[in-house]
Amino acid sequence: MLDVLTGFAIIFVVIGVGFVLAHRGVIGKGEARLQFNRTAFWAATPALIFSSVATSDTSAFASPVVAVIAAASVATMLLYWLCSRLLFPRSGAETMAGAAAASYYNSVNIGLPIATYVIGDATYVIPALVLQMAVLSPFIIAGLNAQGTSLRSIWSSVVSGVTAPVVLAAVVGFIVSAAQWEVPDVVMKPLEILGGASIPMILMSFGASLKGDGLLEEDR
């Protein structure tokens, strides 16, 4: 129990640091804050995912947990689609947007930190992240762009999801683990250090996003 509380304390403290830094103007708004997310997405998080998967047991990817996550996501999307068709008819794009909102979960900002610091193993959240990025996201984007958009544009959206850095890192890491290859320290150690920056950057950016303009401010 103490380990669980410690894990959540780590998460909330780092989020709090991001909020305080944004409040003091150290982390700027908009594009300035999003640099944290972009750096994490393109460099730190892929490094974390590769180093985690490459040194893990590949059986985790066939865990019942992954099957439950996939089934729950698909079932929720289908349930919303059915309700949208029967109870409150909407256009195809609006239905897809609602289905995405109903079934999508925050596997990066919340999933990775909780899996790492509370559960103690990020391996189980990585298949869920890959499911989102490589399967659900391209499908959702294609559905949103289905009307009035060329097939080439839809295909480009699908390819961008499948070739996202975190997806490629997971696939390469899985191959390394399945083949039981040993990554040299000269490669793995820098990746581990870089990956260690992923969750703090994500959480601080999330904390900074909580420092926004209030709805009831006098100048609004």
Residue ranges of each PLM-predicted region?
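Alpha-helical transmembrane segments of multi-pass small-molecule/ion transporters
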Residues: M1-R220
